[in-house]
């Protein structure tokens, strides 16, 4: 790091007046004046660049931004320099955009330079290029020093040429890998206005001296207060070199004529680096390098610690797949098919006529012996007794009931009327005969056969008469249109009223009735 030198410049203005301006060059030439820049936290990495890199950076310094000609921020009240962040940004931009590709050859060093530039912009922000600066006239302004007013009444001034050169030199020194070289103070000094450097003389362990540096005379080698006469009067453009008394040659007695004894102690620099592994995340480890620069040339020894920080970039690639779905609506047109079925049904109509012929039955005559028995027992035949009297209620006689029923057959489309005759008869209990009274069984049997035959003929005759005169049954053919009436099987079709029941006028002949009278009662001609 360059030593700071305070110079007092006396600038004369036109008209014979003089103005005294105090400029603290150390503040502008030091990169650490910017709050967002710390050279101790940056690990040097430039090693493949040419010597005249600083000339290129200085040449393109003013062309980077509009504010590069007035980049020093000044306090409005005390007129002291506050920071040089804009000047430092101009120097980094000139190195990165204009000079690196022409003077350096390492791709790895270029990537590291991008990290330094991005870190500086993240810390200090991207300075505005379009800031309008207005000139301001005050008593401190001169031909070489001018002040400008920016936004928010911020005061700026232009850096002097030597301040700009020293700032560029200090910046390149902090970025240059000096592992095999001495620090900037012990390694080179300023020898011309363009800040061209020349190596200082070095002493080896063997005692052999190197050839003197260009611009120095041999007679001034042993003089500790040596000063280049060529650049005398231009002290404001470079720094004075201070050499400790330990490094000077020890002179013997001049009168003895012995030669000067040179110090054979050679400067010794070595670098120690410690690597610490840490984890900032669960999947990517972090390496932290701690570098110690030991200068054994001076006493006491100087140990410089350099911490290197890495800025990790994460690139995320996202693949997008476009899926397109197409919906098609299909329209269906219905088709109607009409099927006509024709069914032909044939119904058979059958009419049945029943004819009953009267059967002539001869009457059987049963003759009872009127004198055979003292007491004759009558025979009970239904409603009438054998003697022509009505049967008593206790004999349980039941009148003969004849009903007529109507039968409809929908399947055969036929109606048939049937007469039902039901005869309930009960044979009465015969009284016991007295002694000495007998009756012929054969005569009783013949009489019963005759009576039953007469009853059967009478019932048959009445049935025929009912069909002929009193029948309400009409036989007709049914058609398909009457199918609904045929399916009606309600209770009304089978109900009977008093018109359907008839009492038969049958009377049992009395005892000793003649055949003609019996036939008349039975209705037989």
UniProtKB/Swiss-Prot annotation:
Residues 22-448 are extracellular. One of its GO terms (cellular component) is membrane. Residues 1-21 form the signal peptide. The chain crosses the membrane at residues 449-469. Keywords: Membrane, Signal, Transmembrane, Transmembrane helix. The keyword Heme does not apply. It is found in: Membrane. It is a single-pass type I membrane protein. Residues 470-525 are cytoplasmic. Its main location: membrane. Residues 242-264 are annotated as: Disordered. This is Uncharacterized protein SCY_3380. It comes from Saccharomyces cerevisiae (strain YJM789).
């Amino acid at each position: 790091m360059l030593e700071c030198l305070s110079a007092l410049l006396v600038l004369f203005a036109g008209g014979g007046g003089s103005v005294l301006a105090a400029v603290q060059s150390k503040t502008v030439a030091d990169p650490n004046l910017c709050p967002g820049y710390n050279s101790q936290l940056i690990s040097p990495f430039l090693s493949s660049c040419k010597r005249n890199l600083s000339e290129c950076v200085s040449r393109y310094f003013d062309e980077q931004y509009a504010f590069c000609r007035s980049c020093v921020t000044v306090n409005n009240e005390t007129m002291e320099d506050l920071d040089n962040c804009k000047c430092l940004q101009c120097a980094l931009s000139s190195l990165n955009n204009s000079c690196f590709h022409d003077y350096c050859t390492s791709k790895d060093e270029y990537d590291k330079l991008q990290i330094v530039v991005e870190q500086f912009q993240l810390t200090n922000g991207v300075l505005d290029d379009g800031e309008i600066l207005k000139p301001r006239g005050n008593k401190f302004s001169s031909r070489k020093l001018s002040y400008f007013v920016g936004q928010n009444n911020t005061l700026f001034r232009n850096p002097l040429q030597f301040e700009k050169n020293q700032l560029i030199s200090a910046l390149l020194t902090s970025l240059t890998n000096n592992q095999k070289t001495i620090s900037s103070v012990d390694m080179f000094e300023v020898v011309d206005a363009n800040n061209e450097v020349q190596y200082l003389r070095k002493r080896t362990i063997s005692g052999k001296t190197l050839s003197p540096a260009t611009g120095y005379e041999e007679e001034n080698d042993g003089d500790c207060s040596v000063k280049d006469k060529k650049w005398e009067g231009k002290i404001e453009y470079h720094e004075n070199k201070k050499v400790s008394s330990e490094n000077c040659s020890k002179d013997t007695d001049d009168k003895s004529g012995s030669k000067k004894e040179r110090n054979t102690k050679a400067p010794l620099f070595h670098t120690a680096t410690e690597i610490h592994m840490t984890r900032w995340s669960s999947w990517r480890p972090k390496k932290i390098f701690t570098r110690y620069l030991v200068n054994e040339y001076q006493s006491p020894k100087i140990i410089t610690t350099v911490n290197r920080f890495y800025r990790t970039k994460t690139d995320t690639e996202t693949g997008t797949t476009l899926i397109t779905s197409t919906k098609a609506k299909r329209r269906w047109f219905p088709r109607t098919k009409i099927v006509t079925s024709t069914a032909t049904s044939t119904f058979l109509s059958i009419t049945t006529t029943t004819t009953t012929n009267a059967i002539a039955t001869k009457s059987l005559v049963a003759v009872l012996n009127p004198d055979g028995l003292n007491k004759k027992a009558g025979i009970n035949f239904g409603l009438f007794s054998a003697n022509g009297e009505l049967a008593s209620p206790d004999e349980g006689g039941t009148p003969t009931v004849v009903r007529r029923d109507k039968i409809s057959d929908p399947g055969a489309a036929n109606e048939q009327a049937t007469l039902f005759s039901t005869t309930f008869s009960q044979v009465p209990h015969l009284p016991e005969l007295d002694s000495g009274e007998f009756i012929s069984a054969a005569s009783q049997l013949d009489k019963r056969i005759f009576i039953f035959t007469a009853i059967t003929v009478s019932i048959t005759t009445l049935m025929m008469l009912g069909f002929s005169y009193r029948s309400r049954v009409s036989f007709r053919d049914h058609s398909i249109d009457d199918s609904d009436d045929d399916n009606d099987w309600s209770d009304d079709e089978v109900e009977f009223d008093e018109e359907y029941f008839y009492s038969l006028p049958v009377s049992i002949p009395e005892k000793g009735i003649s055949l003609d009278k019996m036939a008349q009662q039975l209705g037989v001609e």
